[in-house]
Amino acid sequence: MWMRFRPSLLVGALALVVTLSLVLAAGWPGRDAYRYLNVFQEVWNLTRENYVEPVSEDDLLEGAYRGMVASLDAASAFLAPGEEVGVLEPAGPGRAGFELLPSGNVAVIVRVDPGSPAAEAGLHRGDQVWRIGGEPTRLKSWPQLRRAVTGPVGARLDLVVLDGRRYRLRELSLELAAPADGGFLIDRPREGLIRLRITEPDRVEGASLADALRAEMARAPATSVLVDLRGAVGLDVERAGAIAAALGSAGPGFRLVPRSGPERRIDVPDLPSIQLPDARFVLVDGTTAGSAEALAALLRERDAARLCGRDTFGLGALPELIPLSRGGFLLLTTRQVVTAQGTSWADDGLAVDRRLETRVARGDDDGDPLLDAALDWIAAGAPEQPATGRTASGTGEPAGVESRS
């Protein structure tokens, strides 16, 4: 039964101990390193000899491996043989209509698309997904989670979810559907303002976005543009560059910087120019991650866009699969993404230019207070005010989402 947690808690505790032991050992030369490794050995021996139930050594070691790598960031993981299949390949066409981010080793829903299967099933931001297709989500990286919740159109997606409002477990089954948009939506929440909401940055085609923006500008004039990147997560920084191009940027975009070896440069492609308003703003929070953070950083540097809302998640490196000699793989971030000017958001995220204060929202039924605050600020002329600093968790709404750094 999935309700039985004692062995998994034991593995998690041991994973924490070995993670701390190995990390501390790596930071101390010579004899001092053994002091930290001895902690692991002592816990290992005490567990094997005294735990009330029989303990599988293989399970303990695998839990330690998973905990150690998962503690690095939201895109790194230890993968047992077979788990690597398709993990870095493009997601399937079917979608349930929600986005996940790992937070404190738990998968948290950070966006639910209106009219989607997820919305019809009553899922909300802040809900925790405990199991996907019978598999626990604990210690899963974002690429693994993305792969698990996408697939062929019409496929069933079985979930065990902790309702973030009522704190009760739900078992539900969704049918994956073809997305109704191209990874973005355009609307006008206030007169004279165009909001571009990026839902899936890794699905956006730059040329299609440029055509849609051009048509919107031809329909009615606008004095400002708000790019809404909340709940947007991805790892394709080339797509981020294409989105920036659709908004009028061009030239150097990003650099992929490995720990050693040559860098790779990613330029923003040239697209036909669009006469967009000069007043540009980007709405972000702690659910803005990966390629969405790359886009926000580029728009601030290249187009003088002002970031508002809450500080971002801090997923600023790209993973690759590294085979292990005895089987399995490491999914490990090996290249940090920085802008042409050297801006990085790995671990700490991007600090906003204007932090927006809102009332505490209980959920989607209470509207969108952060968007309302952004619209009011823009309507007031976007007055200057230094950001008040990062939040206690370094993140924004929904509550409970934090970076894995």
Where do the language-model regions lie?
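Short, Lys/Arg-rich N-terminal segment immediately upstream of the first membrane anchor
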Residues: 1-5
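Hydrophobic membrane-insertion alpha-helices, especially the h-region
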Residues: 8-25
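Cleft-lining beta-strand/loop regions that shape enzyme active-site pockets
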Residues: 26-27, 31-36, 56, 110, ...
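Mature N-terminal segment immediately following signal peptide/propeptide cleavage
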Residues: 36-48
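Extended, small/polar residue-biased N-terminal targeting/export presequences
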Residues: 49-108, 143, 154-158, 162-186, ...
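PDZ/PDZ-like domain segments forming the peptide/carboxylate-binding groove
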Residues: 91-131, 135-139, 203-206, 335-336
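Generic structural signal for buried aliphatic residues
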Residues: 129-130, 157, 330, 345
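Low-complexity, Gly/Ser/Thr/Pro-rich intrinsically disordered linker/tail segments
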Residues: 363-387, 392-394
